[in-house]
Amino acid sequence: MTQLIITHQSDSKLEESEVFLSELNRIKKEEDKFGKFSSLSDLRAIVKKGEFRIVSIYLSSGSILGEIFTFEFLKEFYGVLDFGSVLKVNILALDSIDKVKAFERNLLFSGFIKVKKLKGDGLNSSDSDFEIVIKAEKPSWKPEEGKVLVDDIDLEGSVPDIKNYVPLGQGKESCKSKERACNNCNCGRADLEKEIGVEAARKVYQEKVETGTARSSCGNCYLGDAFRCSGCPYKGMPAFKPGEKVSLANAEGDANDHTVDMNLIHEEKVDLITTTFDDDGSGVNNVQSKGGVLKLNI
């Protein structure tokens, strides 16, 4: 593969280096092309003389690197190279690492990819005496070759049908779908199961939900989901005011909603009063504080 070796016209110190002179002798033997440039137009003319997959630039110091290969220069030089070309910059003596970092950054900003700094590794031999080699590549693809992916996207199929949307609050946990009351039940179903049995209580509660006769036993239903119990039939509905009429959907998501009257539950602590009868039939009332709670619909 033919390579292009170029130097800058003003870099006289490079020709005094024995390392570079040995590189020139190698170029003559391998029939690589050599040229000098003083401006971007000269460099463009040299590159266009042939198809070079590798363009190698030799510099005597990093100071020339910062003076010549500016961002504007590299941006124009990027357009001169063929797609897939490799650029290598060989520096004989490095005087400032900051200039090398700035050069690498300008290479990336100009469009080059795979920018690497190979310290102590020359272009064609591992025992090269060049202090640093910077390698970069011009992409093998053109920007206009990109494919527009929007043509492959099925917009109609990617957007769900609005008819299949699940209304807010549906799918929440509900007592209607359960065989028994929750372990921490506070809606009254657990007490109802103790009185009339599990199956009978389930039917009663289901009927209350479907007919809209359910009543709050915790007093928190109107506050919103953050205060409602897990089996609350009002789960998923917005908060409302006590005594306000609200639309309550059953647990199956039936469209036939029911209007129910939401009553506020008031709780008061009560004492247990027992009466003890003597032999003569007279009774004595005993008051015991059990900390019980009486729930009333207001």
UniProtKB/Swiss-Prot annotation:
A single BP term in Gene Ontology: iron-sulfur cluster assembly
GO molecular function: 2 iron, 2 sulfur cluster binding; 4 iron, 4 sulfur cluster binding; electron transfer activity; metal ion binding
Similarity comment: Belongs to the anamorsin family.
Higher taxonomy: Eukaryota, Sar, Alveolata, Apicomplexa, Conoidasida
Domain of life: Eukaryota
Protein's UniProt name: Anamorsin homolog
Residue numbers spanned by region N-terminal SAM-like domain: 1-143
Species whose genome carries this gene: Cryptosporidium parvum (strain Iowa II)
Domain-related comment: The C-terminal domain binds 2 Fe-S clusters but is otherwise mostly in an intrinsically disordered conformation. The N-terminal domain has structural similarity with S-adenosyl-L-methionine-dependent methyltransferases, but does not bind S-adenosyl-L-methionine. It is required for correct assembly of the 2 Fe-S clusters.
Oligomer and partners: Monomer.
Cofactor(s) it depends on: [2Fe-2S] cluster; [4Fe-4S] cluster
Keyword Chloroplast recorded: no
Compartment(s): Cytoplasm; Mitochondrion intermembrane space
Entry binding sites for [4Fe-4S] cluster: 218, 221, 229, 232
